[in-house]
C-alpha cells in the first residue's frame, strides 16, 4: 500500500495540471515572458508585457521554455517542469533518507511527507522560482552528503554546480543556503573537513558560474539592475514587520497534513539524540533561523527546508517510540481534515462525490496508522484539483477576453489598452502587449472597467476578478460572495 500511495501521488502531480488558467499576477510573469523569449530568441533578458523584468535570474524562464517546447505554449507546458522538479525533489529526499538510515521504507515515507505537504504541492503546480530553487538546493546537499559519507570526490564539484544552478533561479541565496548548512554541520561534527582547500576553490568557481547573469546585467544595465537587485535581495533584510516566530507558526498550515506530527518529531530527534538525523536537523534550523532573522517574511522563503522536515517526520513515524501518541496524532489529523473537507464541500457547494473519499484515511488508519496522513494529503489534493479549483475556474474569464481580442484584431495590428485595472495574465492570452495607465488612442482595442472609459460602447462585456489570485483562500471567499469582481467591456475605439 505504501508504494501504491507513492505512485498515486506521482500521477496526481500531472493530472489536471493544465486545466486551470494562468494565475495572476505571479505566474503570469513567467508565462508571458517565456513566450516572448521563444519568439525573439533572447533568453538572457526577460521581457514581460514589453517591459524588461530583472527581478529574478533566467533559470525559471528556461524551465518554462522547455515545457513550452515539449507541449506547446499552454498551461500544461507552463507548469510541466515545475511538477517534474517537485517530484524530483521528493525523489532526492527519498534517496537521502535511504542514505541516512539504510531503509527504503523511510525513503518512501519521506517522499510522501514532502510531496503531499500543502505548500510544496501547490508550488509544484504553479510556475514560480520556489520549486526549482528547492530542487537544486536539495540536489546540492544530497550530492555533498554522498561525497562526505562515501568519499566520492567527483560528487563534490557536482554539488557546487547544483548550487550554481540554484543561484540562477534566485540569486546568491542559492549558495548561502546549502553552503551555510554544510558549514554549520561540519563545524559541529568534523571541523577538520573545513580546512580542505577544495571547498574554497569550488566556492569561487560556483559563485562565478552562478552569478554570471547578475554580472552581465550590472555591466549592461548598470543602475537599473542595482535598483532591482537591492529591492529583491537587500531591502527585504530590514524592511518588514512580521514577528520572529512567523515561520514556525506558518508551518502549521504550510506543512499540512504532516505539520501536527513534525513538532513532536523534532522534539523526539532532540531528546533521543538521533545522530543520523543531525544533518537534516541542522538544515532545518539554519534555514528557519536565518529567514526568521530577516525582517520581510514570506512563507515560501523557507521551502528549501521542507525536505529536512520530511526526513525528520518520516523518521519519527517509523520509530518504535511514542506509539500511542503517534496514533493519536494520526487520528486527529485525519479527523480534522475530514471535517474540513466536509465543510468545504457544503460551504462551496462542491460535488458531493468527494465525500465518498472521507472514510479512506480512517480505513487506512486501521490498517497502518502511519499511512493515514498520506491518505489525508491525497484527499486534500483531490479536493483542490478536482473540486475547488474547477469551481473557481468558472469565474475566471481572462482567457476569454484574450481570445476575443485576437478575434477582433487577428493580425495584431492595433494597440491594446486596459483601463481601470490591469489583469497580468491578459498579455499571455491576448498574445500581445497590453498598454496600461495610459489614455487610449484612436484605432485601438480597449478593455475597460465599466464607467472608467466612456468614449466607446463595449462590443462585449466580461465579469472579471480584480484581486490577487495568488491569495487562494481569499479568492475562493471572494468568488463565493461575488466580491472584488467587476464588469469590463471590450471595444474598438
What is each residue range found by the language model?
Residues 1-326, 461-488:
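Membrane-integral, polyisoprenol-dependent glycosyltransferases
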Residues 157, 269-493:
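Membrane-embedded architecture of ER/inner-membrane glycosylation machinery
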